[in-house]
C-alpha cells in the first residue's frame, strides 16, 4: 500500500514537472516573440530598413540599387566585402547588358577593362565556324556582350549601390532568419566585430548564391550537380580574336577560352566524373596537358598552356541545376543562384538574374507597405509568371545545349552534336536566330523549340543519308527520342502554357525590352 502511494506521488510529481516545463518553455517563446516584435517595431520607428538583402554579389547589389532608387531603405549584409575571385559570371550577354541599362547600372561595366564580345568561335574535329550576335531592329541595344573579371564588376556594383544614402552595406555573416508564426521578420547575423546581432524589415531577400545556407529552409528545390568546371587564367596574352568566345567541342565535354581583360585569358574545361584528378599533387595539371590540351586547336594551344606553365591557380566549381520555385514562407523572397540555376555553358545566369530584378523592382514599386503579406504574395505570383519568357528560354537552351556538347560513342548523340555544329555553321536565319536566343535578344520559348526541332530534323537527315537502312532508321528514332527527353522535362518544369504562349513572350518584350520604359 505504501509503495502504491509512493508511486502515485511520483507520477503526480512527474506530471507537475512536465506541465511546469511545457508552460515555462511556451512562456519563454511568447516572451521571445514579443521581444522580437517589439525590437522590430522599435527599429522601424528609428528609421530601420524596408528591405534586408542577404548577399552583395551581382544580384544583391543590383537589387539594392533598384529598390533604393524607388525610395526604399535597404540593409545589405555581405559575408565578405573583399573583391571576389570567381570563375563564373565573367560574360554578360547582350540581353544582360540591356537589363543592366534598364536598371541604370550600365556604367558598372566601365573602368574594369571589360572586353567586347560579338559572338562565338566554335571548333569541332579540325573544323571551325564563327557565329555572331545578329543586328536586330527589334533589339534596342548594341548587339554585343562583355567579358570581364567578375570580382571587378561586383565591386563596381557595390560602389554604385552604397553611393545612395538609403543603402546600408555591411559586412556580416547571416546565421538564420527570424520568424514569427511562419512569417520572416528579419535576420540574425554576426557582424565584422564578431558580435551576434539582429536586423528587422518587412521584407527579406535571400540572394546569397549557389552555396546558400538559407535556401533549404525556404524552398524545396534541391541543387543537382551536373558537372565540374575547371579553370585558370593565362596572363599577359591576347587571343587572335579577343571578341569571340572560343568554344571547343572536345571530349568528354567542352573547353573554352575567352578574353576577360586586355591581358588575361580565361581557360576552362568541363569534366563529368566526381573522381577528379587532384590539383594539390599535380595530377590535374598533368591531365590537362595530356588529355585536354591536345584537343585544343594549335592556334590556341600556346595560350591554353601558358597559365599551366606559369603555375596559375586552378579553380574547380560545380555546375548545378536548380528549378525555380517560390518560397514556402511569407516575408521573404529568394533570388539569383539560390533561386534558379541552369548549366552555365551559355553564360546566361546574370542575364536571368538582372531580368528578375527588373521585373520584381517594378512590381514592388507601387506597394506602400512591404509588410502586407497578401499583396507581396500576389506580387510574387505575378513575378513568377512574368519571368518565364526569359528564364524558361534560357533554362531550356542552357541545359539542352550542354547535353548536346557532351561527346559520345553513341551514333544518335554524335549525330545531334554534329548537327548543332552544322546548324551554327550554316549562316542566315538559322545562325542568327539561334544566336539571338543564346544572347537573350529574343527570349521566346516557341522560337527555341523551332530551332531545336530543325536541328533534330537536320541531324536525322544526315543519319539517313545517302539512303535509309533499318539501322539508320533506328538511330534516327533514338535521336528523336533524345530530343524529346531534352525538351519534355522543361515543358513540365516551366509549365506548358507559359512555354508555348506567344502572348507572354510579346508582353515581356514590350514591358522589359522596349527602347523606352513602358
From Swiss-Prot:
Q: What class of enzyme is it?
A: oxidoreductase
Kindly indicate whether the keyword Disulfide bond belongs to this entry: no
> Does the UniProt entry include the keyword Thylakoid?
no
Q: Which reaction does it catalyse?
A: squalene + reduced [NADPH--hemoprotein reductase] + O2 = (S)-2,3-epoxysqualene + oxidized [NADPH--hemoprotein reductase] + H2O + H(+)
Q: What is its EC number?
A: 1.14.14.17
Its annotated compartments are:
Membrane
* Top-level taxon: Eukaryota
> What does this gene product do?
Catalyzes the stereospecific oxidation of squalene to (S)-2,3-epoxysqualene, and is considered to be a rate-limiting enzyme in steroid biosynthesis.
UniProt similarity note: Belongs to the squalene monooxygenase family.
Q: What is this protein called?
A: Squalene monooxygenase 1,2
- Organism of provenance: Brassica napus (Rape)
Q: Which gene encodes it?
A: SQP1,2
